[in-house]
Structures are given as structure tokens and as C-alpha cells.
């Protein structure tokens, strides 16, 4: 993400309202693309369903199918996301760009084989029709490639191309959905599901073309990145735990008193799910601000501080640079939290007026969920920002600890909330997010209190190469590929 912040700094140097809006738009799409796209498409399709007079059962099933597919794909890709990002950073630093595209297809292969097998088994027994099941599986595969490509696109500086891929996915989905349902009279559920699938497919195609434009094709091993998973295993679990903490409360609510069996294995809680989707949009201000403000202003100080260790800086300069870096960090984190507080307060104040404009049938219970989850997502956004700063300082233990506690606290808190009145269901996630924020903040304060020792004293004297199951898997796949090539030559 540091590369993104560095490049965005160039955009923000340009004067004018439109230049500023464009930079914020680029940052928003790059950093929140997966969930933002999913939420916008679901809300938009629900609005179109309302205009089309679709039955409530069809609307609920459409939301369930897209939500299940979205959450499953994000969870599957979350384990590789951070190690792959670290692999990309190392390869770009070492000017080994020829390894990037092979690793993209290698990671896609593993994710698609494992993910599609598991999700396919679920769909077989889910009660979905053959057409619905095939569309869900197709959408799942596209989402996996899209989310994986977003990790790789952090190294691409063509922000206009990324933005157009995002806009194309939304435009094609809505346009095709309108054409199929309103003009051709296709079934509402299958028509909108097909439209969303085609939209994600176009986004996948555009993102893949961008990657091929910037990185060369080569015959390098597509499994090299697996060694980075072993080396940075805490990063893999940090990504997984963060996603589990973010989504577990939704699944638990589906099994609670307000959950309904929509069809077969598809369960949902429409009152809670729609409120959660819209509340999630309230954290965009913090997610974008992290890149635009924290990284753009903090990263130069961070780089100057660590360069003093690498270039033989004197003690006085190191102490001064540390004080300046931490002062900028504290200021930017304070402003980030303040902006999220104002954004949450504004959304809660205006939600009655704004939500009444959408034909989503909001009632008092949904308004309550929305307000509670806005606060919860706001705390999560700030906590996640602090956790990312821990990763900046290579405090992988602190990051995985904070994310693990977040996943456990959000899940346990949601389970406990089920024993209370339905109006309190969102407070379980809110409590988990509050614990996440406090723990990450305390860990950051503790870690930075002795930063020179962390930089110098905790480094291994002799370089160590970690080898585990993923390295063994890489060796096995490489040998299998070599045997296949030798057999083909014979």
C-alpha cells in the first residue's frame, strides 16, 4: 500500500476540485473495491427488484446467493492476500517483475481448485436450481480472480484503468439487468444474477489485461509465492482473522431468531443484512483517508527514519527522525479517527431522510441495526488502520493477535447478543470492533515505545529461511510440472 500512497501524492499535488475528487475516487476504488462493488451491486439490484415488482422471496434469495458468494470468495482469498502482497513488494524491490504474472496464475489455480470444489459441493446440496447453481459457481470463480487481481494491482500505477474496470462492472451489471428484466421479460432472479455475473466477468477481463500490460510473461515457476506464505504465515492468518471478524456476525445472525430459511441451505436475515450492507458504506471515509492522509504524509517520515539505520545515520539524527515520524503518525491517526467520528455522526443523523428515498422497506428495527452497525464498522475501520500501521513496523505478532481477538470477540459477542432482545443484535459486533480498536492501539503504543530495540535488537543474527507445508507444496508442484514437461517431450 505504500506504493499506492506514494503515487497518490503526485495526484494530490495537482490543484483544483476535480483533481482532488479524482484522487479520492482512485483511492476509494483501489482500497475498498471488493466490498464496495458488492454492496453497490446488491443495493442497486434490490432497487431494480423493487421497481420491477419482484416477489419478496425472489429478492431475499438474490441477496442470499450474492452474499454467500461474496463472503465465501473474500474468505477464500483472504489467506493468500497479505503474503502475496509481501511477495509482490519483494519482487518489485529486487526488480524481478518476470515472477509476478506466473505467481498470479499459480495463486489463482490453487484458489479456484480448492474454492470451487468446496463451494460447488455446497451448491449441490443448497437447493438451488441447476441454472442458479451454475451462475453462483461462475460468479464465485470470477470473484476469486478479481479479489486476487486487486492484490496485484496495488503495484500498477494506471489508476484510470482500475477505475474504468470498476465503473464498467457496475454499468454493465445494471444495464444488462434492466435489459433482461424490463425489456426482455426474463425471470427476475436468474436475470439479475446473470447480469451481476457478466459485470464481474468484464471487470475480471479488464483487470487481467491491465496486469498483462504492466508485467511480462515468463516461464518462471508459478509456485514461488508459496514460500512467502511460509515465511510470513502470521500475515496469512491476519488476513483470514480480519475477514472472519468482519463477516462472522452475519452468519451467526442467520442462525438466530430473526434468521429465515430462504431456500434449502440459503439462510438470511433480511432486516439485518440490508442494514449491514448500507452501514458498511459509512467506513469509506476512513479507508480512503488511510491511504490519502496517513500513508501519503506518514510514509516519507517512515522511510527517512529507516534509511538512517541502513545508511549509517548518527544517533542524534535517528532520535530526531523517530520523534518526527511518531508525531506525524499520532496526528494522522487522530485526524483519521476524528473524520470517521464525524462521518458516522452525520450518517446516523441523516439516515432517516436518506434511507426513505430507497425502496428497501426500512422499519424501526432496521433503522436501529443500521445505527448500531455504523458505530461498529467505524470502530473496526479505525482499528484496522492501526493494525495496518503495526504491519508497517513489521509487528506481525501484534497484528495477528489483534485480528484473532477481533474475530473471536465479534463472534462470541454476537452469540451472546442472541439471548437478548432483537434490538440488541448489532451490539455483539460493536463490542468486538471496540476490543479490536483498543487492543491494536495499545499494542502500537507498546511497540513504538522501544522502536530502536525493535529495529536492531529483535532482528536475527543469521538470516533464516522458513520452510513449511507451503514450501513443500511448491516443491511438489514444481517437480510435477517438470515431469509433465519431460513426458510431453518424449
Give the location of each predicted region:
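N-terminal membrane topogenesis motif
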Residues: 1-41, 60, 64, 226-235, ...
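Hydrophobic alpha-helical transmembrane segments
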Residues: 165-212, 423-445
Amino acid at each position: 500500500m505504500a506504493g499506492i500512497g506514494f503515487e497518490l501524492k503526485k495526484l494530490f499535488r495537482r490543484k483544483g476540485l476535480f483533481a482532488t475528487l479524482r484522487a479520492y475516487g482512485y483511492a476509494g476504488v483501489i482500497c475498498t473495491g471488493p466490498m464496495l462493488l458488492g454492496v453497490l451491486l446488491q443495493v442497486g439490484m434490490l432497487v431494480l427488484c423493487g421497481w420491477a415488482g419482484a416477489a419478496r422471496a425472489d429478492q431475499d434469495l438474490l441477496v442470499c446467493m450474492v452474499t454467500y458468494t461474496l463472503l465465501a470468495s473474500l474468505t477464500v482469498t483472504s489467506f493468500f492476500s497479505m503474503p502475496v502482497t509481501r511477495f509482490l513488494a519483494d519482487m518489485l524491490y529486487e526488480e524481478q517483475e518476470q515472477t509476478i504474472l506466473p505467481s498470479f496464475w499459480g495463486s489463482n489455480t490453487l484458489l479456484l481448485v480448492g474454492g470451487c470444489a468446496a463451494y460447488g459441493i455446497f451448491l449441490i446440496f443448497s437447493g438451488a436450481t441447476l441454472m442458479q447453481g451454475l451462475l453462483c459457481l461462475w460468479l464465485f470463480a470470477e470473484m476469486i480472480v478479481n479479489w486476487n487481481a486487486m492484490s496485484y494491482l496495488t503495484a500498477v500505477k494506471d489508476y484510470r484503468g482500475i477505475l474504468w474496470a470498476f465503473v464498467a462492472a457496475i454499468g454493465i451489471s445494471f444495464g444488462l439487468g434492466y435489459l433482461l428484466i424490463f425489456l426482455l421479460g426474463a425471470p427476475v432472479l436468474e436475470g439479475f444474477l446473470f447480469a451481476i455475473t457478466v459485470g464481474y466477468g468484464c471487470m475480471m477481463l479488464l483487470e487481467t489485461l491491465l496486469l498483462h500490460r504492466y508485467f511480462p510473461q515468463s516461464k518462471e515457476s508459478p509456485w514461488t509465492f508459496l514460500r512467502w506464505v511460509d515465511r510470513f504465515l502470521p500475515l496469512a492468518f491476519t488476513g483470514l482473522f480480519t475477514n472472519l471478524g468482519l463477516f462472522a456476525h452475519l452468519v451467526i445472525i442467520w442462525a438466530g431468531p430473526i434468521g429465515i430459511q430462504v431456500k434449502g441451505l440459503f439462510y438470511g436475515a433480511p432486516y439485518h443484512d440490508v442494514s449491514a450492507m448500507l452501514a458498511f458504506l459509512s467506513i469509506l471515509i476512513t479507508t480512503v483517508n488511510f491511504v490519502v492522509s496517513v500513508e501519503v504524509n506518514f510514509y516519507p517520515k517512515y522511510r527517512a527514519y529507516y534509511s538512517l539505520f541502513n545508511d549509517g545515520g548518527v544517533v542524534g539524527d535517528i532520535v530526531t527522525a523517530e520523534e518526527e515520524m511518531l508525531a506525524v503518525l499520532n496526528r494522522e491517526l487522530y485526524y483519521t479517527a476524528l473524520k470517521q467520528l464525524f462521518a458516522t455522526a452525520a450518517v446516523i443523523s441523516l439516515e432517516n431522510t436518506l434511507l426513505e428515498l430507497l425502496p428497501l422497506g426500512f422499519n424501526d428495527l432496521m433503522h436501529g441495526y443500521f445505527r448500531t452497525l455504523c458505530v461498529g464498522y467505524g470502530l473496526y475501520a479505525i482499528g484496522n488502520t492501526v493494525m495496518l500501521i503495526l504491519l508497517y513496523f513489521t509487528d506481525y505478532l501484534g497484528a495477528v493477535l489483534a485480528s484473532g481477538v477481533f474475530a473471536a470477540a465479534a463472534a462470541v459477542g454476537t452469540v451472546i447478543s442472541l439471548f437478548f432482545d432483537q434490538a440488541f443484535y448489532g451490539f455483539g459486533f460493536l463490542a468486538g470492533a471496540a476490543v479490536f480498536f483498543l487492543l491494536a492501539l495499545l499494542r502500537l503504543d507498546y511497540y513504538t515505545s522501544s522502536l530502536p530495540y525493535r529495529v536492531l535488537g529483535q532482528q536475527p543474527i543469521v538470516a533464516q529461511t522458513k520452510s513449511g507445508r507451503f514450501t513443500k507444496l511448491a516443491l511438489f508442484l514444481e517437480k510435477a510440472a517438470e515431469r509433465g514437461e519431460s513426458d510431453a517431450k518424449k
